[in-house]
Regions:
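Alpha-helical transmembrane segments and adjacent TM-loop junctions that form the membrane-embedded core
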Residues: 1-23
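Soluble cytosolic regulatory domains appended to membrane proteins
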Residues: 23-216
Length: 216
């Protein structure tokens, strides 16, 4: 909450300036950017604040595809999996929210589960419950949707995770609240459990390794 509060305030301010499509905006994004730069030069804004506001102004130009964790490296769970099976899978332990896919088609994400909810059910000895019993609905966006739209929807719905799909509805990646905040700050938020900081780079490396294996 402490981290996101100033971002929410600035985001709402900038959104308010440009939200009306019926009325001509009195100030353009370029003018706001120029004013912020002048403010930074005169000491009104610190360098980090200037950078953050500039990033906020660019959110409409950044797509989900640019910041998402690609599906090829995302950890997802099958809906028929029991809570016992889920808990035994170490790959899920570092994530608080895990997308759940249809058992007949892993390109179709049905929702997500909260790790905390699973731990609570396990504490009640409900080991044989399935993920489908506790699944939650998840927000979905197109690969081409901009980050500003994703940010506003996540805030409005009080959600922290969203699924990115292509034009056919197939799973292409994940964008979290953390991803959007990192984009705003212009820096990566590294958790103590994070092992890979650039998931898109990891996806490229994984694809290259698969191609090399196929050509042997």
């Amino acid at each position: 909450v402490i981290i996101t509060y100033p971002l929410v305030i600035m985001s709402e301010f900038i959104t308010h300036i440009f939200s009306s499509k019926k009325q001509q905006a009195s100030v353009s994004r370029e003018e706001v950017s120029a004013m912020v730069n002048v403010g930074a030069e005169e000491g009104v804004f610190e360098k980090k604040e200037n950078s953050m506001i500039q990033n906020l102004l660019k959110l409409d130009d950044i797509s989900a595809r640019d910041i998402m964790t690609p599906s090829s490296v995302a950890e997802i769970a099958e809906e028929s999996m029991t809570l016992r099976e889920f808990y035994r899978n170490e790959a899920f332990r570092q994530f608080s929210r895990i997308p759940v896919y249809n058992e007949e088609n892993d390109d179709y994400i049905k929702g997500y589960v909260l790790r905390q909810a699973i731990l609570e059910k396990l504490a009640e000895d409900k080991f044989d419950l399935r993920l489908s019993d506790i699944i939650r609905p998840v927000l979905t966006f197109q690969e081409t949707d901009n980050v500003s739209k994703i940010w506003e929807r996540l805030l409005a719905k009080k959600e922290h995770i969203s699924i990115i799909i292509d034009e056919y509805g197939c799973f292409r990646g994940i964008v979290t609240m953390e991803d959007v905040i990192e984009t705003m700050l212009g820096t990566e938020i590294v958790d103590e459990k994070d092992r890979v900081t650039d998931m898109q780079e990891l996806a490229r490396e994984k694809w290259q390794q698969e191609q090399q294996q196929n050509h042997k």
